Curated annotation (Swiss-Prot):
Keywords: Cytoplasm, Lipopolysaccharide biosynthesis, Nucleotidyltransferase, Transferase. Activates KDO (a required 8-carbon sugar) for incorporation into bacterial lipopolysaccharide in Gram-negative bacteria. GO terms for molecular function: 3-deoxy-manno-octulosonate cytidylyltransferase activity. This is 3-deoxy-manno-octulosonate cytidylyltransferase. It catalyses: 3-deoxy-alpha-D-manno-oct-2-ulosonate + CTP = CMP-3-deoxy-beta-D-manno-octulosonate + diphosphate.
Amino acid sequence: MVNIHVVIPARLKSTRLPGKMLADIAGKPMIQRVYEQVAKSKFKSIIIATDSQEIKEVAENFGAKVILTRDDHESGTDRIAEAVTKLGFADEDIVVNVQGDEPLIPVENIEQAAQLLIEKPEAVVSTLCERITEAEDIYNPNNVKVVFDKNNYALYFSRASIPFERGFSENHQVSISEFFRHIGIYTYRVGFLKHYAELAISPIEKYEALEQLRVLYNGYKIAIEQSAKPTPAGVDTLQDLEKVRKLFDV
């Protein structure tokens, strides 16, 4: 039987919003909000992987299982790879990476991402996306765009506006029907996750600062489909944090 685990990578020294994992959201730190959201699911286990003693203490105080990792990881995926190795998960097990800055992610989407990987044996990773509905989101580098093939395998992820609409000009109203925003949730097979950590950082991964590009660069498949439910964007900026706080205060 394949066990499905959730690991939440949590780094205190975020580049764009330092300390955001412990930012207060209606009386609770953000990492607790994320953990409680994930806990509504029925997966085998939920673990927080962090390089911060402060986050570890906070998380243990609200009852989470925590594992300390190195502080020099290039990405959350690398951090999770260390965690699953320490935890001794079997290669055939599945791990869902739920970002520690997505307190509003629907449980249905987490379960959907895990099921997608089970249904796509050719893929080593699965993830989700949703159609972009506002033109301004196409040009926001914090909204990662994705293009995928007819079989629902990702072709490329970018902070740029992909696909490019040929003939576009400032006076042209861009069609947004074919633009998709990547939702920052990943599901991996544990055996591949361990291998991922051994792969060199790819040039495109470094250029775009997108960890999933290491998978594509090395010739592996990422399965992707539109999410069952809308997913609010994660907390990357102070403005994002204020928006989330207002939603919890309602």
